[in-house]
Each structure stands twice: as C-alpha cells, then as structure tokens.
Amino acid sequence: MSFPRGSQDRSVGNSSPWWPLTTEGSNGSQEAARLGEGDSPLGDVRNEELAKLEIAVLAVIFVVAVLGNSSVLLALHRTPRKTSRMHLFIRHLSLADLAVAFFQVLPQLCWDITYRFRGPDWLCRVVKHLQVFAMFASAYMLVVMTADRYIAVCHPLKTLQQPARRSRLMIATSWVLSFILSTPQYFIFSVIEIEVNNGTKTQDCWATFIQPWGTRAYVTWMTSGVFVAPVVVLGTCYGFICYHIWRNIRGKTASSRHSKGDKGSGEAVGPFHKGLLVTPCVSSVKSISRAKIRTVKMTFVIVSAYILCWAPFFIVQMWSVWDENFIWTDSENPSITITALLASLNSCCNPWIYMFFSGHLLQDCVQSFPCCHSMAQKFAKDDSDSMSRRQTSYSNNRSPTNSTGMWKDSPKSSKSIRFIPVST
C-alpha cells in the first residue's frame, strides 16, 4: 500500500472495504494511488480469484461466529445454575463477538460480493462507525473481564463490596467508551465520486485524510487504542495475577513443610486459642484458589487468542503507512489479505474456549436442542458418576466424630481450621 505525497487533502479507498483502518488496499489500492498521482487508473477491475477466496473465508467466519456465540448466550439463558460475575462478562463478550460478526464480517461479505459500496452516504458512515465500534467493544470487554479477575485474585475483599454493581458499571463503561471512540468514523468516511475506466466515474465509500500525516496519525491512533493500550493493560493485570498466585503457592508450600517438620520433632508451634493449637486447613483454601485459577486460565487463553488473531492485522497496518516502499495489491499479496481477514477468527474461538473451561455450558447448550437429548443424558450420567466418586472419596477420608488426635481432612471439607490438643 503506497500513499502518494504531495496533495494536501486526498480521498483514498478502503482496503478490501471491510477493513476500517487501512485506507487503500485490495479493492482500491491501484486506483487510489494513481488518482493521487494524477494518472489515469487501469480500470475498474479486481482479482476475482482472491475475491472469491475472501467471500468464502468471510462466509465461514460469519456462520461459525454466529452459531458459536448464539449457543453460548442460549446456554447462559437456559442454565438452571446460579449465574456468577464471570457468566455476566462471558455474556457481554459473546455479544461483542456477535457485533463483530454482524457489523464487521457481514458488511464486508456483502461489500466483496458487490465490489463497490451500494448505498447512500449516511449508510457508508454508519457501517464504518459500527465496524470500529465492534473492534473497540471486543477489546475493551476483554480488558474489564481481566480487571475483574485481577480484583478477585489480588484484592478478594473488594469482591464483597457490591460486586454485581461494580461489574455492571465496568461493562457499561466499556460499551459507552467503545461507541464514543468510534464516532470519528462519521467524519472520515463518506461516499465520494471516483474516476475509473479511462474517464468513467463511479461512487464508493472512501476516507479523506490530510496529507502527508493524516493517514499515519489515524492508523497509529487506531492501533494504539484498539490493540496496544488493551494489551498493555492486560499484560499488567496478568503480571500482578501471576505474582500473587506464585506468592500464594510458595506460602502454602512453606507452611506445609513447616507443619511436617513440627510433626516429626514432636514440637507444636503455632497460635493458641483456649489451650488448642490453631493451624490453617489448606484444603478448603486450595479448592477456592482452584476455582479462581480456572477462570484466570480461561481469561488468559481468551486474551492470547485475541493477540494471536489481531497482531498480524495491526502489524501490517502500521507497516503499510510507515514504510513508503510497502505496496499492497490483490495479485501480489493475497496472503496478507487473507491474514487480515482471519483476524475475525477471534470471535469464532471465544465460544469454544468458554465451553472448554466451563463444561456445564456445553451441557446446557446441548440440552437446549431436542435432537441432542441422548448426548445430554450422557453428560448428565458422567456428572453423576463424577459426583458419586467425589462423595465416596469424601466419606472414606473422614474420621469418626468421636476420634481424638489428628486426621486427614477431605479435599472437599468445609472446615477452614483444625484444632490439635496441646498439653499445657
């Protein structure tokens, strides 16, 4: 993609019109470059083979994203279990992914079929606004979800202070902020008249930038707001989360070793309460930490998928505007075009990540369809067998109520402390 210098204010086309960041590309790069230089365009043509591939890829992404995220929303709606804060964030992240499917992928699919934008000026501006709005919403919903995990792990006492209200406020803020930050699209894109086919004129939805710095400023700002800033916040939150978990595990390991050493020497060391030595029971703490760590792992995988899917797209965007020798055409760089299209795979991956880490969501989703009742019964049987094994293990590990001395608590024990008789 080359941006000719010299004009103060120039209209340029949208790269494979769906992509809201790039200003020239697969559908308009040759025309825009030549129009900016004052030359005649080669004609209103495009690489039809690449266009067919784009249409096929976008169609698959759209169907998979809609089915996957709709299934998650249906499972969350029909689940008989009590919904948690994490379920609330998953619901809104699924809504953001559906926004990507309907506001990004679907317009691009229609645009690739028609080649030129078919619609009035207001529709051009609305489509461009919604495309960037979906990108902001998906990124910022990940940020607030990770921030919630940071608060739950590093500041657990704050989760007792109206957690539902705080979660809803965080989610509402991300939606509103995404809408506001995407409004400049209304003033950048519009339907303008362009010249093709040796004098023939047509209309398309293009962007207008002040040269030479307008394009670079726009792409750099969008990359920073949609990708760089969220990744920095996500990385910082996960740095604190990992440090807190590591410190917690190290403390438990040291406490366990200290306890074993005291048993071997026959010495009792610890705080006293009414003639009894009080020691923390690690089992119940482990069960709570295990649940938190599972949600942290799920959020980490979602964030990793977001970075892996979107990083190539933003790298190409920055490369295209800062390297004057970079040229993007349909026939010469089909791999770059497809790599950009695959960025929306992130919206397809998220539903399966939810179901993998929350097995009951898959079960509730299957139960929503009458044709899958046999599979749902299999899930229910597996859950019943698993619960039976846990109850058997619990009863075998418990000591009779009239026993004295020490015993090994079951991992599912609700006791948080144990009392060891100490001679006084």
Swiss-Prot record:
Pfam families: 7tm_1 (PF00001), V1R_C (PF08983). Gene3D superfamilies: Rhodopsin 7-helix transmembrane proteins (1.20.1070.10). Residues 77-88, 148-168, 242-299, 358-424 are cytoplasmic. Its main location: membrane. Residues 1-52, 111-125, 191-220, 320-337 are extracellular. GO terms for molecular function: peptide hormone binding; V1A vasopressin receptor binding; vasopressin receptor activity. This is Vasopressin V1a receptor. Keywords: Cell membrane, Cytoplasmic vesicle, Disulfide bond, G-protein coupled receptor, Glycoprotein, Lipoprotein, Membrane, Palmitate, Phosphoprotein, Receptor, Transducer, Transmembrane, Transmembrane helix. A lipid is attached at residues 371-372 (S-palmitoyl cysteine). The gene is Avpr1a. Glycans are attached at residue 27. Overexpression of AVPR1A in the brain increases the duration of social memory. GO terms for biological process: calcium-mediated signaling; cellular response to hormone stimulus; cellular response to water deprivation; G protein-coupled receptor signaling pathway; grooming behavior; maternal aggressive behavior; maternal behavior; myotube differentiation. The keyword Phosphoprotein applies. Changing residue 371 to G: Reduced palmitoylation, coupling to G protein unaffected. Abolished isoprenylation, coupling to G protein unaffected. Signal peptide: none annotated. Residues 1-40, 383-416 are annotated as: Disordered. GO terms for cellular component: cytoplasmic vesicle membrane; endocytic vesicle; endosome; membrane; plasma membrane. The chain crosses the membrane at residues 53-76, 89-110, 126-147, 169-190, 221-241, 300-319, 338-357.
